Amino acid sequence: MARDHVRPRVVVSKCLEFEACRWNGLKISSGVVKLLKSHVDFVPVCPEVETGLGVPRPPVRLVSGETGPRLVQSDTGLDHTEKMMAFAGEFLSGLGEVDGFILKERSPSCGMKNVKLYPGPGKVQATSSKNAGFFGKAVLDRFPGFPVEDEGRLLNFTIREHFLTSLFTLARYRRVKAGGRMAELVGFQERHKLILMAYDQEKMRLLGRLTANREKRKFPELVRDYEEILRAALARPPKSGPVINVLTHAFGYFKKELLAAEKEFFLDALERYRSNRIPLGVPVALVRSWIVRFAQSYLNEQYFFDPYPEDLIEVSDSGKGRELR
């Protein structure tokens, strides 16, 4: 089942494992980013440094303005809003093909949510309002449907698993789209059928009808619609119910070969997964072992059981108690 996985292209905040460019001159440790370096082509960026702020520097913050938040240095009162907005627009416009983003949590520039908003510069208490940082908001606005997370949320194994699944799936799709061949798109749909079944069965059927292409549509037009539906299907983590349905469907391929005790153990694992007592990786590993044991060719082709490189699967499915730092 081992595959030669595609390498996604991911924009990352440069202060995460790449350079000591945070406002206080530090580099931030992130186990997720460190692990992904072997499997991802990262594009590091520090929007604050790129807009002329030095290292170290007085920190910037989001400050309430008449027309919305402003990006202001708390010590000096200097407003960097226009510079940041101009940089974000220029950088993202020239980025080229990209598959996802990992941004610094709660950063007034990179944060994607939960960034504090202050009533003014200086020593004042933050308001109750939470916002996205300026660069983070530009990413979310310009790249809807793309995998975008911060390093803090990626410590949660469920969020991390969803992020990696959607990231590598969309990177594989980008390769298919670049190939320009209908046969490759049909193959992509077939190999991702169980992933799509777990995420959104209705959209899985829509994508199946698109790849059937009974209207004989041209490839560029068809993939535009396919991509829109695919991104919508992968936008949110799958619920446990549909995932269990997929695993039960796969289990059906082996029912005649398995011992009664094996069947009972698997069904018990499904119930424990349903009640959040074990991670998804436990029942998935059982099915993976049967795929190898019984040489089940159809399931062997399904990315549901191997959505991203195996060492990432082991960490992502390690359980609630373990976190990467």
Positions of PLM-derived features:
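Internal, conserved structured core segments that host functional sites
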Residues: 93-176
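N-terminal extension/subdomain marker
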Residues: 2, 6-8, 20-22
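Conserved acidic residues
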Residues: 8-9, 99
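Flexible, glycine/proline-enriched loop segments at strand-loop-helix junctions
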Residues: 19-22, 75-79, 118-129
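Glycine-rich anion/phosphate-binding loops
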Residues: 76-95
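Acidic, Ser/Pro/Thr-rich low-complexity regulatory regions
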Residues: 142, 147-325
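N-terminal glycine-rich anion-binding loop in soluble enzyme alpha/beta folds
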Residues: 20-21, 25-70
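Short, hydrophobic/glycine-enriched beta-strand segments
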Residues: 9-16
